[in-house]
Amino acid sequence: LAKVKLAHDLKRGEVLEIVVESLANGGDGVGKVAGLPVFIDRAAVGDKLKVRLFDVRKDFARGAIEAIIEPSKERAQPPCKHFEVCGGCQWQHINYSAQAAHKEGLVRQALKHIGGQGDNDVVIEPIADAAGGGELHYRNKAQFPVQYVDGQYLAGYYGRGSHSLINVTECSIQPPAMDQVLDTCRQLLKKYKVHAYDEAKHKGLVRHINLRQSFADGKLLATFVVNHEAQKYSKFKDNQDLVVMLDVARDLVDAHKNIEGVVLNFNPEKGNRILGDDSLVLVGIEYVEEVLKTKRADMPQKLREGLKLRLSSSSFFQVNSVQAVALLEIVADMAKSALADCAAPVVVDAYAGVGTIALWLSPFVHSVVAVEENKDAVSDGRANSLLNDLTNVEFVEGRVEEALSRLMTEGTLPDLLVVDPPRKGLSPEVLAAIKEHGPRHVIYVSCNPTTLARDLKLLSDKGEKGESNGYKAKRIKPVDLFPQTYHVESVVILERF
């Protein structure tokens, strides 16, 4: 194969002085050398750096900081002792007000460069940030891979740009109680000589330790993901590989009185999927209960008293309980505006998870249909409807790709569609269904500015004959649910044109 001719003379190993001009989606700082963008991990805008290039391509290069010549005014002291090696956070070295501003900028950049929309095309409102105490210890869920290395049980996060595991003993974005429970888990695996999973050989038992904590009462749920076929409890005690986990579970609950339950999740498959489809409760119950409460006087009394949510180990729920309320308030405001002329509004909530958005909107509307494919999340959602005495929410188990067209063409047509897809965004099937059958208004909740911008562009495209069957984004509100990282949520209200 012929070598690609480079339009520059940069070489791997070369050391350059670079001034960081911006931050990219992914967290890297970006500076330019002869017009070529250079991506630099752990950089801040305004840094003057000595950078060693380790990856040089035709259109970009990557470099590592050799020295900080002049630090940016945005730099801050990272609160976590693992930050320099851990891949969990990207922006702890940047002060929080600057983090929030850059996240808003990432949304603008994506809309402009991918979605083709400038400031004159859509209103991008100031970000709803977590300033005032919500910048640290906010995570209500964490998933820790487990390895056995040099006689030591490791559980934590993968290192920066690697598959090596960092044994996290203190994490500044999760509650201290999680640190304590994780440490006990490591000790118990060692005590009972439980084999950690070896991904390369597909051998060993414990793959992950997952922890979920309620911010309402501090209770925790611990889940051990094991490399084993699903077992019923009747056969469980005859299996020597698994019965040891019952001892681990009992000791864990004895050591931490705030643990509500210990669950075994079975995942015998190769690959990087974390959870399997089947679980077994070893001790206690299979869920914790969260309460989301608004302080706004203009919200319904039920939401001021608090929306109760049952969360099992595998159910999707926002990882930041406090900022989830801010996001839900924004969704409700947009929904009220969109439905102002509807006498008995009907809402479809796609990718509903445990029903957080559906249940939050239920006091404002006549009825909500929540679509979710995860059976455990649907079970939690139905339980949450009963828990909150909400009788106008129906849960439909199934893939959004298959259920959405049917729901929007049969029976009572929805007045509003809410979509909250995973990071990969909306599939072509869902985009087509929305354009063909969707209601006048759509609210799009996104956790990825890149796929959001792509989908907004696709939803705004006119038909092959130029017919107007698309949607225009009217307002976008970024929300920070992930301080110390580059991740940012956005809530968008779209209207048919």
Residue ranges and their predicted role:
Residues 1-82, 394, 402:
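Terminal RNA-binding accessory module
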Residues 3-17, 228-497:
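Rossmann-like S-adenosyl-L-methionine
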Residues 29-34, 156-159, 223-225, 381:
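Short, acidic/hydrophobic/Gly-rich beta-strand patch recurrent on exposed beta strands
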Residues 46, 174, 320:
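Short, conserved phosphate/pyrophosphate- and ester-handling motifs at nucleotide-, phospho-/glycolipid
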Residues 66-78, 84-196, 215-217, 231:
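Extended interfacial segments that mediate partner engagement and assembly in macromolecular machines
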Residues 165-207, 228-232, 236-263:
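Internal alpha/beta scaffold segment
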Residues 210-214, 219-232:
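Carbohydrate-binding surface patches
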